[in-house]
Amino acid sequence: MKKILRIMLISICTIITVMVVFLAAVYFVNLISNEREKGKIESYGQKVLVDGKQMNVLIQGDGKETIVLLPGYGTASPVLDFKPLVNELSPYYRVVVIEPFGYGLSDDTDKVRTSQNIVDEIHECLQKLNINKYTLMGHSISGIYGLEYVNQYENEIKAFVGIDSSVPKQEDSDELPVSSLQLLHQSGFYRLIVKMNPDQLVMPKVDEQTKDQIKMLTFRNFLDESQASEAENFINNFKNAQRLHFPKNLPVVFYLADQTEEETPSWKPMHEELLKNVDHGKVVTYKGGHYLHHTKSKEIAADFREFLSNNESHR
């Protein structure tokens, strides 16, 4: 009997030791990888001083009209994520990609991520760049911030474009389990999961070097202080947006993904509801997933050019 208990005790101790060694290995591999990757992340764009911190911005193209691109939640590198769309738009427009605090190469911030604070920072950035007239084009959560933005700076906005953009009354605006996800990241298990299943990182159609940069920025920025605060403020930001509507004279176009419409039957009707009092608005559905700017950049750019041209001729 004592021999059996001794064997069981040794087995339990062995299992615990193996688990501790495994956890420690995952943690330290992540720690070392993070340090190594700091020197491998390549700079792009330019820095703008906003609210005492550095906000990263890319400007591409020399067109007379300006388009400002705003990312979806948690985008590791908005500049690299929007690359296919920027390449389609920049021959005709000046394209400005904003990397909000906590995204891409921008600084992190401890300022609460309310829609108002995010809008204020984006506007300050554009003012510093002397950009005073532009089309706002936003993906996903930027539909909420964009709605706040156009109501505050209507005189500066020529049009609003939503790429499968969020709407105030959508049903999945719940808070994320921030603490659990941060623990997953800090422990190194997020890196391990990505290593085992790299396809879970949604990537645009870019070269391998760019994909590597996106991957490194994903590990660097994942649920940093800004993104954690943003997630914790989802419910309030969506709720506050329910008081808003698009200005009557503002041209608005929504590019929606048919996969999102299938998953959420109310998706298209909710966007159409936002356009009911808009003089020049439309909804276009493309086949594809939530990241339409990865797969339908050419179609979006062509349709937007026609949409903007038609609205210019009606003025």
Pin down the residues of each PLM region.
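Alpha/beta-hydrolase fold catalytic core
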Residues: K2-I67, P91-Y93, N132, S309-R315
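Conserved HGGG/HGGXW glycine-rich cap/lid loop of the alpha/beta-hydrolase fold
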Residues: K53-L105
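Alpha/beta-hydrolase active-site loop signature
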Residues: G74, P100-G104, Y145, V167, ...
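Active-site loop/oxyanion-hole signature of alpha/beta-hydrolase fold enzymes
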Residues: V97-T135
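Conserved hydrolase catalytic core segment
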Residues: I131-D174
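A catalytic-pocket lid/entrance helix-loop region that shapes and gates access to the active site
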Residues: I163-K195
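Conserved serine/cysteine hydrolase catalytic core
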Residues: V206-D279, Y286
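Catalytic histidine-centered segment of alpha/beta-hydrolase-like enzymes
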Residues: G288-K298
